[in-house]
UniProtKB/Swiss-Prot annotation:
Keyword Ribonucleoprotein: yes
Gene label: rplN
Protein name: Large ribosomal subunit protein uL14
Family listed: Belongs to the universal ribosomal protein uL14 family.
GO BP terms, alphabetized: translation
One Pfam family linked to the record: Ribosomal_L14
Source organism of this protein record: Synechococcus sp. (strain RCC307)
UniProt keyword list: Ribonucleoprotein, Ribosomal protein, RNA-binding, rRNA-binding
PANTHER family: 50S/60S RIBOSOMAL PROTEIN L14/L23, LARGE RIBOSOMAL SUBUNIT PROTEIN UL14M
GO CC terms of this entry: cytosolic large ribosomal subunit
Record HAMAP family: Ribosomal_uL14 (MF_01367)
InterPro entries cross-referenced by the UniProt entry: Ribosomal_uL14, Ribosomal_uL14_bac-type, Ribosomal_uL14_sf
One GO MF term: large ribosomal subunit rRNA binding
Subunit structure: Part of the 50S ribosomal subunit. Forms a cluster with proteins L3 and L19. In the 70S ribosome, L14 and L19 interact and together make contacts with the 16S rRNA in bridges B5 and B8.
Length: 121
């Protein structure tokens, strides 16, 4: 579960390393889960890349430490909280995605992120 002030790792090569959640997009929502879009600020970035420190970006959550129940009865959780930075068209700003992503992203129409990911769990 991601809420305001939560730090997340960035799982793409857009230039940002860590982001901090400012707001969970949706109607008066408090927590974000896998597949939800958040507004975040870049806290740590690599130099000479597309994203700079203190930029305001939109990102989609791809991994959470909080256990997620699936309809089949399986439970899944990841080792870290991670997100992929996206543009207004819901396409990733980077060209690569690092680490596994959850299958729920395909149901939420983030197929470009799923196709770039090395592993879908």
């Amino acid at each position: 579960m991601i809420q305001q002030e939560t730090f997340l790792n960035v799982a793409d090569n857009s230039g940002a390393k860590r982001i901090q959640c400012i707001r969970v997009l949706g109607t008066n929502r408090r927590y974000a889960h896998v597949g939800d879009v958040i507004v975040a600020t870049v806290k740590d970035a690599m130099p000479n890349m597309g994203v700079k420190k203190s930029d305001i970006v939109k990102a989609v959550v791809v991994r959470t430490k909080h256990t997620m129940r699936r309809e089949t009865g399986n439970a899944i959780r990841f080792d870290d909280n991670a997100a992929v930075i996206i543009n207004d068209d819901k396409n990733p700003r980077g060209t690569r995605v690092f680490g596994p992503v959850a299958r729920e992203l395909r149901e939420r129409s983030f197929t470009k992120i799923v196709s770039l990911a090395p592993e879908v769990i």
